[in-house]
């Protein structure tokens, strides 16, 4: 038996030398010697016929051979796998001197950029940012704002009604009147950005959904000069410090007096063009009363900005639909950092 074990040891190492460069052959060798019906298994079965004294010696030699085969095969497999990996890495070697690939960096949507610009301005002036429901009751969307049932001004804001008492808000003024009630007659300075909805036919300049940002100030001794200065700050922030504005009378049921604000554009021939950008006015006394303010003690002003209109004028865009088509060719023009976007 000892001679047989010695011969098997020689046989294993001879086969190993022939097949150690092939992983599949090593697996076959493993199965041949260590498998369930392999050479060592059959050798172990032969122990049963040996005398007790020889059985112990032969069993020990078989275990030594088994451990030698296991460790040797494991070592050769690791060497072979490591060599294969190194060869693969050499084939896929990276040249660190090559220039890196440029990739597109995301940026805020142009409408959000304008909202953030306005928000930063008003936060620096001590205003708070308030947001609210896009589905609103008729009471807060119209009645609290001096537009009772049947008021003709409701026709100015064709609405999407969900049921007789609920609709998609037509402005963010619903946020303002709720905040006024929450303050219980105290002063406030807020802006309220968000999406609003009106039953308009979609075309180059109209959309049934658009972005709006409204502002509201309530305090003692507020007058029209405060409103005018605020409007100048807005236009200078958005269009430059030299930008002129033109104020003209208008009508809104929730402000009195009410005005429209136009940008004054001087053409090359010296003539002037007026582009409407927002509406504003002093808060109507009835709106103050509705929110439990005493109009004899408190006054206020409000303004509403259509974000898409500002963006279209600022960036000379001729179709509002561009903001909502998600065309990366359009949007990347407004990326704040275009360093890595040149070849996208």
Curated annotation (Swiss-Prot):
Task: Provide this UniProt record's keywords sorted from A to Z.
Answer: Aminoacyl-tRNA synthetase, ATP-binding, Cytoplasm, Ligase, Magnesium, Metal-binding, Nucleotide-binding, Protein biosynthesis
Q: Which GO terms describe its biological process?
A: phenylalanyl-tRNA aminoacylation
Gene Ontology cellular component list: cytoplasm
Q: Give the chief site where it resides.
A: cytoplasm
- Gene3D superfamilies, alphabetized: Bira Bifunctional Protein, Domain 2
Per the UniProt record, one Pfam family is: Phe_tRNA-synt_N
Location comes to: Cytoplasm
**GO MF annotation terms:** ATP binding; magnesium ion binding; phenylalanine-tRNA ligase activity; tRNA binding
> Which cofactor is essential here?
Mg(2+)
Protein's UniProt keywords contain Cytoplasm: yes
Textual note on the cofactor: Binds 2 magnesium ions per tetramer.
- Family designation: Belongs to the class-II aminoacyl-tRNA synthetase family. Phe-tRNA synthetase alpha subunit type 1 subfamily.
PANTHER family associated with the record = PHENYLALANINE--TRNA LIGASE, MITOCHONDRIAL (PTHR11538:SF41), PHENYLALANYL-TRNA SYNTHETASE (PTHR11538)
Q: What is this protein called?
A: Phenylalanine--tRNA ligase alpha subunit
């Amino acid at each position: 038996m000892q001679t047989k074990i010695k011969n098997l040891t020689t046989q294993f190492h001879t086969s190993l030398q022939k097949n150690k460069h092939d992983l599949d052959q090593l697996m076959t060798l493993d199965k041949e010697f260590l498998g369930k019906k392999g050479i060592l298994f059959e050798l172990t079965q032969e122990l049963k016929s040996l005398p007790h004294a020889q059985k112990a010696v032969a069993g020990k030699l078989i275990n030594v051979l088994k451990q030698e085969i296991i460790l040797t095969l494991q070592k050769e497999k690791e060497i072979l796998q490591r060599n294969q990996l190194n060869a693969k890495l050499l084939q896929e070697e990276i040249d660190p001197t090559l220039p890196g690939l440029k990739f597109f960096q995301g940026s805020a949507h142009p409408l959000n950029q304008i909202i953030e610009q306005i928000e930063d301005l008003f936060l620096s002036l001590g205003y708070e940012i308030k947001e609210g429901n896009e589905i609103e009751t008729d009471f807060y969307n119209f009645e609290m704002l001096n537009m009772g049932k049947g008021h003709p001004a409701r026709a100015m804001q064709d609405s999407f009604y969900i049921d007789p008492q609920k609709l998609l808000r037509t402005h963010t003024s619903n946020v303002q009147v709720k905040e006024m009630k929450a303050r219980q007659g105290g002063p406030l300075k807020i802006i309220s950005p968000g999406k609003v909805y009106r039953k308009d036919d979609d075309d180059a300049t109209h959309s049934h959904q658009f972005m709006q940002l409204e502002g509201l100030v309530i305090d003692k001794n507020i007058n029209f000069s405060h409103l005018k200065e605020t409007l100048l700050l807005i236009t200078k922030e958005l269009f430059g410090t030299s930008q002129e504005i033109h104020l003209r009378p208008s009508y809104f049921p929730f402000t009195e007096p009410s005005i429209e604000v136009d940008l004054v554009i001087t053409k090359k021939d010296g003539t002037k063009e007026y582009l409407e950008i927002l509406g504003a006015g002093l808060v109507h006394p009835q709106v103050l009363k509705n929110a439990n303010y005493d109009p004899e003690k408190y006054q206020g002003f409000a303004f509403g900005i259509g974000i898409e209109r500002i963006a279209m004028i600022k960036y000379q865009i001729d179709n509002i639909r561009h903001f909502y088509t998600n065309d990366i060719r359009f949007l990347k023009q407004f990326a704040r950092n275009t360093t890595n976007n040149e070849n996208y």
